[in-house]
Amino acid sequence: MTQQQTAILANGEEQGHSLLFFCVRPAGAPIRSMTVTPLPLTGEASKHPPTPDAMKASNSDPAFFAGSLWIMASGSWQVRFDMNGAAGASSASVPVPAVPTALLRMQRSVGGMLALLGCTLVLGFVGIAMAAAREARLAPGSVPGPARRRRALVVGTAAFAFCAVAVWLGGKWWNVEAANYAAEMHRNSELRPRLDGNHLNLLIGDPDPAAEDGWKEVENSDLLTDHDHLMHLYAIRWPQMDAVFHLHPAPNGKRGFSEMLPAMPAGTYHLYADVVFRNGFPETETASLTVPAGMTGAPLGSDDASAAPQPLAAGQLGPGYKLPDGYEIVWEKPAALTANTPYNLAFHLLDPQGRPAADMQPYLGMAGHAAFVKTDGTAFAHTHPDGSAAMPAVVLANESSGLAMNGMNGNGMDGMADASAMKMSKEPLSPTVSFPYGFPSAGAYRVFIQMKHGTTVETGAFDANVQ
């Protein structure tokens, strides 16, 4: 995409606007300067960038740049990095979804200070009005009489009433704005699973009071193909996390998805369905599914995979995970893991003789896939190796290079850009894969890693305690 490969960490907080912090380390030729610019992902505004903000190079590490910017509206955005260095000028764009997710209460100390300042302003306004009514037309040195004092009192009362009404109306206006903001806060679409035998049907939709049943289904044409499929579905047996399936339900015409499930141990499964909407906005829809005992299963699809690690109650999994065919996935596990810290987590696939696997193949166009799942169910992330790109990033790259994205027009299903836009190079793949990730909170996590050799998709499982 660019002359330099760039690793980026972004943290944001939604409070009506989004403040993003960026830490960038280019992995190419030395960089002298770097700027960052927020732009809408699509539309006319994406063609007219604002003035860029300069990023600051570290005094101790000139290759490390840091900066921040505000995104002032919700939607699908791109953050563009423009670089100048030994290799010339270059740029990279990163898709960033910006949505309000919460309402935050004002801190009491701030509220008290603002209330005090407001009272001061009101009293000052009333005092000025009273002084004007009492003394504005007096000759210098004259003393106001009783009539002027009474008039000043009347004017002061009217001024105070005016301020009180203005404050009341302002409060009403603010409450309406807050209610509108709350109504527009981002909420993931709802995933509704239904199991008939081993036939799984999935519908994605949103509450809609205008719809006949109060619920409106999402059209499949509103979704983008990402890594060869419209939907990536993880099914993890709960609460022991001792069975995991990475499936890819096929679209059912205009709405919904379906899949003939493989043989699955009975129990309750947490479902995590990754989809990307046409505006570039990714979502992970969640639901639960109960699989009955004795369910007849179909063979796994060519792109599907599964694993049966030991249950959480059996103890923590180590840094090496033995696979059924004798291969092993080994994690270069850091000595300590802390929350909100960026890591580049490396995993190695070894053959039965303990040597690096020599027949590596891309899995869904990637060198590997990872799922980081917190054992209390509060966090899930499906990630890809360092240097890979999601569909919104591929769209940005093709637009910047003048390439057309088939399927971005019309109903969007036929010929949509898929693996051809992001296939790995024909060079031999390394048996070592690194996943950039930062654990969002302290606690216990189970990590599922998938790599492919020959025609076999391997799934390893690992446990992590994050401080």
Feature locations, PLM:
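N-terminal soluble domains immediately following signal/targeting peptides that reside
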Residues: M1-L138, V143-F160, A166-Q467
